[in-house]
């Protein structure tokens, strides 16, 4: 869910960071981000269907633990690690429907099991009608290229997206 906001079509982002040492000597570090479009401004309108990771991305994480996210997008999976979520976004106020997808190891062609999360089946009811996540149900191997194939309907028009990305061994922020 947090990825959606980080790649949203807002025009302004505010960032604040603070650290605190508690009385029992525990360090707490907080990062606060505010995404907004000021009153009187217009959102940046994406053209067509967009994804993240993007074609050619090499700094995506290979693993993601849904239970570490709040709210949890896959509470039924427990504490297991899965692959990095692949975000799909259609133009604002249009529906993504009839989505089908596959994620394959590009070199060997082996399919990665996936789950497609949309506004229709989101357990937390957080996704908009133009949002979807493709969730690989196993961690992705660092340094290996994965091919992603997506088809569906956006704004009443059929679309298809094909791209590849390579998870990094470590992701430094």
Functional labels for PLM-detected ranges:
Residues 1-48:
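Long, contiguous interaction/targeting segments characteristic
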Residues 24-27, 156-161:
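Beta-sandwich strand segments
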Residues 31, 35-107, 149, 161-173:
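N-terminal non-catalytic regions of secreted/periplasmic and cell-surface proteins
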Residues 112-124:
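Solvent-exposed serine/threonine-rich low-complexity stretches and specific carbohydrate-binding patches
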Residues 125-134:
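Aromatic sugar-binding surface patches on proteins
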Residues 134-140:
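Extracellular/luminal low-complexity segments enriched in Ser/Thr/Pro
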Residues 140, 144-150:
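Short beta-strand segments enriched for Tyr within beta-sheet-rich domains
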Residues 151-155:
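Beta-strand-rich extracellular modules
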């Amino acid at each position: 869910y947090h990825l959606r906001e980080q790649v949203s079509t807002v025009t302004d982002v505010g960032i604040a960071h603070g650290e605190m040492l508690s009385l029992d000597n525990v360090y707490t570090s907080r990062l606060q981000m505010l995404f907004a479009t000021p009153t009187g401004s217009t959102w940046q309108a994406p053209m067509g269907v967009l994804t993240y990771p993007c074609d050619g991305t090499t700094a995506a994480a290979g693993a993601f633990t849904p239970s570490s996210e709040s709210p949890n997008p896959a509470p039924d999976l427990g504490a297991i690690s899965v692959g990095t979520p692949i975000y799909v976004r259609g133009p604002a106020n249009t529906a993504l429907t009839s989505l089908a997808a596959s994620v394959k190891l590009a070199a060997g062609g082996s399919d990665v099991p996936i789950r497609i999360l949309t506004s229709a089946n989101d357990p937390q009811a957080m996704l908009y009608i133009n949002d979807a996540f493709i969730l690989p149900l196993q961690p992705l191997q660092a340094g290996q290229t994965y091919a992603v194939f997506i088809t569906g309907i956006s704004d009443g028009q059929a679309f298809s997206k094909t791209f590849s990305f390579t998870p990094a061994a470590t992701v430094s922020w």
